[in-house]
Amino acid sequence: MALTGFRAGRQTRLDYRARRHRVSTAVGDNEVIERIDAFCDAVPRRRARPDEYGPLVIFVPTGSGWPYYARPRRGSRPPVTAADIRAVRARQRELVIPESFEWIEQTAPEMAAAAAEAGLEVQAHPLMMLAGPVHVPPLPPGVTVRIIGPEDPELDRVWAVPAVAFSHPGTRAGEAGAAERDKIAADHDAGTIAMLRERLRSGHSVLAAVFGPDGPLAAGSCQAVDGVAEITGVGVLPTERRRGLGAAVTALLAADARDRGVQTIFLSASDDAVARVYARIGFREIGTAMIAEPAR
């Protein structure tokens, strides 16, 4: 599915064949997975035109912004084959959009093998839902966490935090920090920030960040459709990792979504180590989020 957060958040490639036998579902999980799958189909339709190709659908961008993925059609459909994926890849090349596919493994179990046969690299990520109360982790001294409004003067620097984080993948501490964040913020495209500001005004997205004396240190976002919300793009400056800041952002976004009446709150973890962090907040693994794209 491409869970909309996968692309920003993935950092580690996991063997989808190994994961398939590790995920056990509880009573009611299939219903939750169905709601999440509907969410992943609905979100791209806000800013893209759906074009169906056999059992798959491509979301063709209708304006600026991040290009979307292809995914299995919802409802009754034939199984996805390698030939279907090759046909969609050809169309994606014609449209000059990424040859990317995202789906939930439990809704299209045949698709991983088809994607691999079609020459794509297949990645698997823990799909998790908030299963109880939000456990808010303690913050280190000298930092605060808050929701960011559309007119917040720090909006551009908050936006830049995940850009730095995901250009230095992994969870280990590193040297990139405030200077890199501020450079990206200074060089930002005004249209991108304007689009983000509009999404915050409309309520389509919620943004949160952790702040220290030198500005934003961690950030993430959440978007909701029809009672389902995804937390996505949680990133921490490499200089600030291993301090619980990403967990603080995630917990605030989850609590905020619940306060707004959202019933199903989910996310995807980049790997099992990150999944354990989310588990301490109150998330539980219910399935597997899949990505397939050309090997880099």
Regions found by a protein language model. Name each.
Residues 81-89, 233-238, 242-255, 259, ...:
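Conserved acetyl-CoA-binding loop-helix of GNAT-fold acetyltransferases
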Residues 79-163, 167, 292-294:
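Acyl-donor-binding surface of acyltransferase catalytic domains
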Residues 108-122, 247, 271-288, 295:
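Conserved active-site alpha-helix within GNAT-family acetyltransferase domains
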Residues 95-104, 257-270:
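Conserved GNAT acetyl-CoA-binding A-motif
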Residues 177-178, 187-235:
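A conserved beta-strand-loop-helix scaffold within acyl/acetyltransferase catalytic domains
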